[in-house]
Amino acid sequence: MKDTSRPVTVARTVLLVLGVVDVVRGVMHTFVLTWAAENIAQIAPHPDALMLLGLFGNSNLLTGALFLLVAFKAREIAGYILGIIPVAYFVGIVGIRLNGVSMQSEFTGKYMMLVYFVVCIVTFVYFVVAGRRKSKHN
């Protein structure tokens, strides 16, 4: 039987929305690459940058599909997935910084990603805290 408790439902819904967001990001990074680079990320459309952006689009399509799959087939773990997302990106950012790489472009997508991470963290904390309260009352 599927868990329909409020924390699970909230986490599932947020993961579902993020899945759709990632699919849209994947389509933009993969199929409208130059337009997205110039108009959204505001980075120079250098061929190497576009190649990396396109490859990142592939991973966006993958994560979007996996988030949707979890939301529909394994809703009980949706909250944990939301906790893993910012940790994975943080590890990636640490690796980038350790290699001395820094952005030179405006990269306006960072504001959307900040909201993305805050939503993940707030929902994960709610999922864990509400889940613990529920288990104490049972």
Show which residues each predicted segment covers.
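Non-cytosolic membrane-interface motifs at loop->transmembrane helix junctions
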Residues: 40-44, 103-115
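Hydrophobic transmembrane helix segments
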Residues: 20-51
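Core segments of alpha-helical transmembrane spans in multipass integral membrane proteins
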Residues: 20, 47-68
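Juxtamembrane helix-break-helix junctions at the cytosolic face
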Residues: 64-80
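Cytosolic juxtamembrane helix and N-cap/initiation of the first transmembrane helix
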Residues: 1-22
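Membrane-water interface at the C-terminal end of transmembrane alpha helices
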Residues: 117-138
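Hydrophobic alpha-helical membrane segments
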Residues: 80-97
